[in-house]
UniProtKB/Swiss-Prot annotation:
Name of this protein: Chromatin modification-related protein YNG2
Intracellular or extracellular location(s): Nucleus
Binding site residues for Zn(2+) 1: C227, C229, H251, C254
Comp. bias regions, Polar residues: 8-24
Keyword check for Membrane: no
Family: Belongs to the ING family.
Amino acid sequence: MSFERPQDPSSALEQATQDVSNLKSESRFLLEEIRASDLEFYESKKRFLNKDTQIHKFIKQHGSLVDNPKEAEFQERIKEDLERCHQLQVDKCTVANSLLYMVTKHLKKVQANIEALEEDGLLAPLEDDAVELANELSRESSVLSSGTSLERRKRTVAAGTLSAGSSLRKRVKKERGRSTQRDGMLSEPPSDEASSHGANFADDLQDFNDELFSLNQQEEDDKQLYCFCQSVSYGEMVACDGPNCKYEWFHYGCVNLDEPPKGQWYCPECRQEMANLKLKKKKRV
């Protein structure tokens, strides 16, 4: 594609504004795809964690020697959800890479126009910070365009996005005060449609955050420590019937059990506490 040199800065600005006129809607569409994938990902993750929790609860209640009639079905569903989560992550990388490529393409064109105007003496050279930013964006676009395979792009997009994004945010704050007039020319008042979309997005985001909090809470519960050894739940475990037991569940090996106890069972500490109470009652009598 041939490069048409701009005649003056105003024509370059007008061309750049025209080129990015659809960028907002295109970016929103891609970001909504990523968000939809995130929601589906956390739903799948919640499902397989729930199935895994049910399997472990059955083992706690009946021991590992008793067959769980639903374990095979649960394991198959867990496998399906894990595979779906993996595919969703791959799809998100592809969409994010498309968005990065789309933005970088416009930035490269703006940079080329600026360099052409500087060469023709129609534009003063950029300040040091702006030059560094332009060079950094150029390096990112080179990395993106040099990759010929999707896997290679996926490996570079994460680091590139973080690097360019963090530098851009820092420097835009510095330049914002200098470009008030230019921003006023390009900005548009928000439309009713945009406001409605923002309100719907805020509601959906709140629902998503609530689901994420619930999922994190469930994960924290799975990390609870039990037994004298203060470890997470694993293998065969037995529950103490002591009403005030501070450990609640015990691993068989830690309390010298080989099979589920018959009737009520108390841990050594609770048995000692019960014995002390009986001794105190006898002394009072």
